[in-house]
A protein has these predicted regions:
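Non-catalytic structural scaffold of enzyme domains
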Residues: 1-143
Length: 144
């Protein structure tokens, strides 16, 4: 197994929870976390801006030798993950829109989603919602 690190990026520190979970499963793996607070929040960025930010963050992590990049941000995942996978020759893992686990686990048939406008307006969010939450009532609000 390669000693190269696993890279993470997010628009801030929200993805630290994900980093901790990965660390608990893979404690001996080297990891690099990029908290991109300069460009935060990502939710109000145009698709072009978000692509540029995600490409730049990925290039930074690749320069550090990362063997895998985890996009620890819903907005960047929903808007950019497929473009990142096509552009770079390393695996990318993204964050699945949270409506899926919420819809699968609701006891009341209702779910609430608090996300950026970018996430709520993305094709991936709508596909996931249509596939997994069509039988529940969802209340969606932006966090911005």
């Amino acid at each position: 197994m390669s000693n190269n690190p696993i890279g993470f990026f997010d628009s801030g520190i929200g993805g630290v929870t994900l980093w901790k979970e990965v660390h608990s499963i893979l404690p001996y793996e080297n990891k690099i976390y990029l908290a991109d607070s300069i460009n935060s929040p990502y939710g109000d960025k145009s698709d072009k801006e978000l692509d540029e930010i995600s490409f730049k963050n990925s290039e930074f992590l690749l320069e550090k030798g990362c063997k895998l990049i985890i996009v620890a941000c819903n907005t960047a995942t929903t808007k950019c993950i497929e473009k990142l996978r096509r552009r770079f020759d390393v695996p990318f893992i993204g964050i699945e829109p949270a409506i899926k686990p919420a819809a699968l686990n609701t006891k009341t048939g209702k779910v609430g989603v608090l996300a950026t406008e970018g996430t709520l307006g993305s094709d991936l969010f709508h596909k996931t919602s249509n596939k997994h939450a069509s039988s529940v009532r969802s209340e969606e609000h932006t966090s911005e």
